[in-house]
Amino acid sequence: WELVKNLKKGKAVFSQPPMPIKCAGAPQKAMYLSCDHWFKEGVLNDINVEFYNTGAVLFGVKEYVPALMEYVKKYNAALNFEHQLVKVDGKAKVASFKNVANPEAPLVETEFDMLHAVPPQSPPDFIKVSPLVDSDGWIDVDQSTLQHKAFANIFALGDAINAPNAKTAA
């Protein structure tokens, strides 16, 4: 929040890592809330806002996209899809993004005055090393019953299971 409040001009870069993350909308919420603050402070016109999303679309639920695009337009945010943050040089203030649609393409490097980076997320280590997980490290449950696929006396729920839902409490 201090970075947002203190930024009066320059470039603000926001990134969204590949799924799963606990809340697919959180990286965008950070951008919209920051932009709204800058808009109300009268400095948004002096800030270049860029959003880099590893995914190919703004949001996975297409019915929400038109409303979100209104905010993107209001805040004049540049959208960059299929770009994953892979490196940050904090001293030089440069963020590097891989084009996931074309992995052979050179990295896209962009300077920033403020960077909001959401780290990739995974299950806790104590879960990943247990015998309860699938090949990706998530607790392996039947998505309809939440019963473990190998251990009938185990049920699991929450953001450590391999169900395809967003890992969020929202």
Question: Where does each model-flagged region fall?
Answer:
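Residues at the starts of beta-strands that form the adenosine-phosphate
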Residues: 11, 46-49, 153
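Amphipathic alpha-helical segments in well-structured domains
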Residues: 27-31, 65, 170
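A Rossmann-like FAD-binding core segment of flavoenzymes
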Residues: 39-141
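Secondary-structure boundary/capping motif
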Residues: 22-26, 60, 164-165
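FAD-site-proximal beta/loop scaffold in flavoenzymes
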Residues: 1-8, 111-170
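Glycine-rich dinucleotide-binding loop and its adjacent helix/turn
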Residues: 1-43, 143-144
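Cofactor-binding loop segments of dinucleotide-utilizing enzymes, especially the Rossmann-like FAD-
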Residues: 17, 54-56, 159
